[in-house]
């Protein structure tokens, strides 16, 4: 079975090592991070750049939608929420989304879901599973968030068909955060989590 690697950095670890992160990213990554006014956003940006640099020394390229990639692979995708910054890595197109599992007012968000998904939310299905499943597929295909309503959230786990291609999605809870990983394949995959505790 194929393996998807999931690297995680706790935001507290990243804060503790901010000085080291500043030394481990290039000048453009540093400039990008320091443009953020909020320090937590600076640290998230630095940690994300650190993860990308750890993966490859190749220059980053960007597709038409702005999704970063390496010319010679591997495929990767980054997300952050709450306590964590995560990066999923695969030999095929990949998307990841993480959301802190907390109470949320659904009234303003229900419009982004199709009828079946909205019904599930109204019947108390977990919003974050639906959101993460949608978001990870959007990120896998490198599409715009403007298309979110047409992106299928279901199933949370298993094969889904979109635009004539098969994707396999896995959703799970890790330390009070919901994570969805979507990969361009109809084959299941295992996830190997690597927690980065020192930088």
Please report, for each region that a protein language model flagged, where it lies by residue.
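Core catalytic alpha/beta fold that binds nucleotide/phospho-ligands
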Residues: 1-199
């Amino acid at each position: 079975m194929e393996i998807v690697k999931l690297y995680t950095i706790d935001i507290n670890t990243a804060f503790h090592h901010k000085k080291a992160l500043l030394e481990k990213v290039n000048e453009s990554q540093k400039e990008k991070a320091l443009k953020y006014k909020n320090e937590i956003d600076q640290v998230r940006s630095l940690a994300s750049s650190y993860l990308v640099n750890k993966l490859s020394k190749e220059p980053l390229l960007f597709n038409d939608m702005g999704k970063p990639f390496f010319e010679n692979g591997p495929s990767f995708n980054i997300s952050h929420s709450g306590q964590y910054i995560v990066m999923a890595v695969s030999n095929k197109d990949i998307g990841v989304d993480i959301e802190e599992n907390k109470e949320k007012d659904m009234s303003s968000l229900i419009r982004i879901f199709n009828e079946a998904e909205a019904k599930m939310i109204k019947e108390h299905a977990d919003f974050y599973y639906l959101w993460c499943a949608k978001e990870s597929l959007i990120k896998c295909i490198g599409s715009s968030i403007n298309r979110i309503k047409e992106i299928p959230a279901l199933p949370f786990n298993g094969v889904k068909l979109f635009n004539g291609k098969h994707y396999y999605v896995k959703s799970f809870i890790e330390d009070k955060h919901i994570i969805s990983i979507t990969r361009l394949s109809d084959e299941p995959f295992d996830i190997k989590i690597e927690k980065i505790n020192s930088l």
